[in-house]
Amino acid sequence: LTSLSLPSDDTFSPFAETIYKQKYAQPGEEWRDTARRVVETVMKPYFPELVEEMADAVATRKFMPGGRYLYATGKRFHQTQNCLLLKVEDSRESISDLLERVASGLMTGAGIGIVWSALRPNGAKVEGMGGTSTGPIAFMQMVNEVGRHIMQGGARRSAIWAGLHWNHPDVFDFIRLKDWSEDIKAAKEKDFNAYAPMDGTNISVILDDDFFAAYEDPASEMHDWAHKVYWEVVEHMLTTAEPGFSIDVGENAGEHLRNACTEVTSSDDNDICNLGSINLARLNTKEEFARLVELGTAFLLAGTCYSLVPFEGVAKTRAKNRRLGLGLMGIYEWLVARGYRYEQNDELASWLDEYAKSTEIAARYAARIGVSAPVKTRAIAPTGTIGILAETTTGIEPLFAVAFKRRYLKGKEWHFQYVVDATARRLVEKYNLDADDIETAYDLARDPERRIAFQAWVQKWVDHGISSTLNLPSVGEQQFTHKEFGEMLYGYLPDLRGVTAYPDGSRGGQPLTVVPFWEADGAEGIEYEEIGGENACVGGVCGV
């Protein structure tokens, strides 16, 4: 593929316009107004000389602040952190305090990540009160139900992550926690709001240095346990999609806490997830990218000073760690525009070297305004909704599909629109590529090692983690055995901070459904409401 010119237009597609107006625009705003509101409010008190340059970068979608910035900046309660990372200890007081913090965090728009490993297992004796413990899973389910009934901003479902260590006695019940019956999956397919166990929570088994030592040492008393845990999770990844793995080894040992999408890590209770992403697809030169690394770092640092907090413990941890989550999006489009496949290359490595300089940049800007230097600065988020607005590929993901139906929540009702991926449309219409020839996540699903290898390679430049979903063929279509997949994956685990897989159709109510290009082409901008499993047009001209 020859080098392609990069997008220059600033006009939203119909679907991106719908999402922007529904989720982020304040009354009377257009996108440039939103960019000005967010950047001027957050940065002017700290770095006024950067406001004009950064506002233009956001207006042209070269930098995309996290969704909480777009939604909450300028509001009376401006909580602009995407997520909170929480601990719980094995006591009634700690559990009660956790539930209060969860409700407060969710109601102010933050996703929640919790590690439950400190709680004693189900059936263990409770000496003080007598009786036995319910174990961590019961409390995970309680948090999930809290999230079910809290609509963030009236439209956004609560986002929750639960982690449990591989050596916890309840880990096998945890692994099977989201084994939904066929009836439940069918109900989810008809109505995404239908009840299913833990349906608002992503779950991961946490692997640490002790796991790898036990797995490799036949003499270890935990050797068989480690193997059983690993292979049962692999089986679930390839069939039900959950749980995934979270990995904390070497210099990252002890950083077990995660945000809801798992790209931000910490060892400290009440830590934050503070996100914004550089859109590589709209950049022509490495020098421009380097400048955006500096601007984005300064913006997020200012955000740690601007954002209010849902409870006091967050302010204390934030002042100590001041974590930034400077991310990337549009990597796949950047690769295609330069004629590269979805794999490592020297040019991208040289750009990532500039990305890694955010550590030094953050320390320099922190000293200027008299705050602590961020302990870590880079995290690649999945950038789902923000990726829609940027109209490029999300995070490090390949192109999901050339065309699809995307479901979204509007109030309490589910709607969908046909979408031709903005990147795919540019390739089809401007460069005369055949839609069937564009490599997508579904094509790469047949070669999962390429996806895993690329994630492990990019992770070298990321001091937090990368949130990425490994799309796989449906259970009956996989061309590899569980053993082949598991052995391949194990070889990469020490170089990853986490891994999540999604076999096609493994859960009902998928938000994205792949459709042929011809089906979606010409049908964009029409909004459909799902009524009893059927589709009713509620806007535009209904031609399908």
Could you say what each language-model-derived stretch is?
Residues 1-80, 86, 487, 500-522, ...:
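Acidic/polar, glycine-rich intrinsically disordered N-terminal extensions of enzymes
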Residues 12, 30, 73-77, 91, ...:
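Secondary-structure capping and boundary motifs in well-ordered enzyme cores
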Residues 21, 26, 38-47, 55-128, ...:
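Function-dense linear segments that define catalytic or interfacial modules
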Residues 96-104, 120, 132-144, 178-194, ...:
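Extended active-site and interfacial segments that coordinate phosphate-rich ligands
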Residues 121-160, 286-309, 412-453:
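A structural-propensity feature for long, helix-poor, extended segments
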Residues 256-269, 276, 300-307, 382, ...:
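Catalytic alpha/beta core of large soluble enzyme barrels
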Residues 297-315, 319, 330, 335-383, ...:
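Internal maturation/activation junctions in enzymes
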